[in-house]
Structures are given as C-alpha cells and as structure tokens.
Amino acid sequence: MRAEVWGCAVPRVGPHPVVILTVNRIAEPLSAVTVALVTGSAGPATTHVRIGPEAGLTKYDESYVNCADLHTVDQSNLRRRLGRLAPVEMRTVESNLRGVLGL
C-alpha cells in the first residue's frame, strides 16, 4: 500500500486523492492509515512533491503531494487505487516529511 495513490473520502475534506504513507507491515493489520493529500496547486519545494502520470491522476496538468497536509483515515475510506509514486518521488516525499515533522 505504501506509496500508492488512492481516491479517498477524507473526513472534513471530502473526496480527494491521497498517498499512503504508512509502511505495509503496519498498515496490513490496522484499520487506519496515514496519508498525505494530493493537490493540483504547486507549493514550496520543502512541502510539495511534484508527481508524474504513473500516479494515475489526470484532473490537473500537474499534481503535488502536500507533505504538510497529513491525515489518518480508516482504510474503509479508501475508494479506488489510482496509481503509485515512482521510487524517486517517494524518497522525496520521505525527505520532505522528515523536514515537516522534524525527524
């Protein structure tokens, strides 16, 4: 699941694409996962990671993972798998998360 892009019913946000951040060995037995919202708006490179077409998103010309907009959602809120981040994109997301969270 980690690094996959899903359409998700995000509480208090509504339907939105998200990237799964929770590692697979933890996500499997849990009912909830941590996700980052995907947006069509560019932001600072320290928080936003541009993602390519293999992520499965077509609404905007460019899409970005917002590493500062994190949510924990029940796995039942995940509606449809759309795609997956490229390994280099996920490494950049991980780096940005360390900066955002001070890890």
Language model regions located:
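Conserved functional hotspots at enzyme active or ligand-binding sites that engage polyanionic ligands
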Residues: 1-103
